[in-house]
Amino acid sequence: MIYEFGQRLRAALADTGSGVALVCWGLPAGMPVDAEAMTGAVAAMGPWEAMPARDPGMPRILSGVCGGVTTGEPLVLGLTGGSAPAPEGLLPFRPSENDLGLWAKWGGGVRRPDACRTMALLAALGGICRAALAGLGIVMGTHIAQCGDVRDAELPECDVDELRAQLSGLEGRVLPMTDSEGAEELRALLEEAHEGGDTLGGTLETAVVCLPAGLGRPDACGVEASLARNLFALPGVKGVEFGMGFGFAYLCGSEANDQLVAEEGSIGTKSNLSGGADGGLTNGMPLIFRTVFRPAPAVAATQQTVDPVTLEERALTAEGPYDTAAFCRARGAVEGVTAAVLLDLLLERRADRWPCGRGDGEAR
């Protein structure tokens, strides 16, 4: 499985049967590596008490780091223990999994990537990249914007200081929401679904503060395109939108434009409907986007499927435990690919050594 974060950073996921590794190429020599940030990003995927078999464990740095900084060689992160072995023969297709597509493309006996282990390795890489960005003054955070009828309070899209404070307040929360009452409602909703052997989908909203203007490219490798491409590679993602996103369909151009203002020697905008990016380039405002995750397909209820050998319809019941809130665990992976994509765009300015240049654009 290959992840191309941009023009320079690439990563490959390799499953050897005895372990899983993520190899990342393109990191500059001398970039500080915060091991605590890496482990913290993975730990935030928990707790795993209700489903210990899905606990991916803690990744380790195998190579590419010496003395707390990158060497310029590929960074290798590893997890002990392999994924489930490839099944012998064809099994009934699981509804809304990619079993049917894998069978149509490669036939039987394909090893299915473990979503939790994939997420853990991406979260680990993201923890390293995110800490490096923080050293440049770039801060990011993610909250649960919606699950069912439960909605969190909206983020202050233009007030950088207030937004930074709210993002900081999300750290360490099992249910990262700014509205404490909403968090309790969500907790009750998750408990109800868990007791019924069901799963829930949700929307994660990510904000990045203090990005310089002009980061990205005005083409298919722009900041929105690069982020969307990598976010859609995460298990369960079904939608990505920036700023107003699909809400732009309800607006006229005169309502949808972010009008420019001059403040204290820098250029900003009165609003942030575009979500901090226009035409593939950042505009200096906070970068804000939402990622929608479908409910995990494995549920206690009996589902209808088709036996690939006999082509007969049959009933299928998935074995538990069931991942009721898979979207909550995905926060680290979302921030992981976000940090990797943004780091790649920064490296375009000065790719050979750390720190990479901030450019001439001033962030608000």
Where does each model-flagged region fall?
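Generic N-terminal targeting/processing segments that precede catalytic cores or assembly contacts
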Residues: 1-364
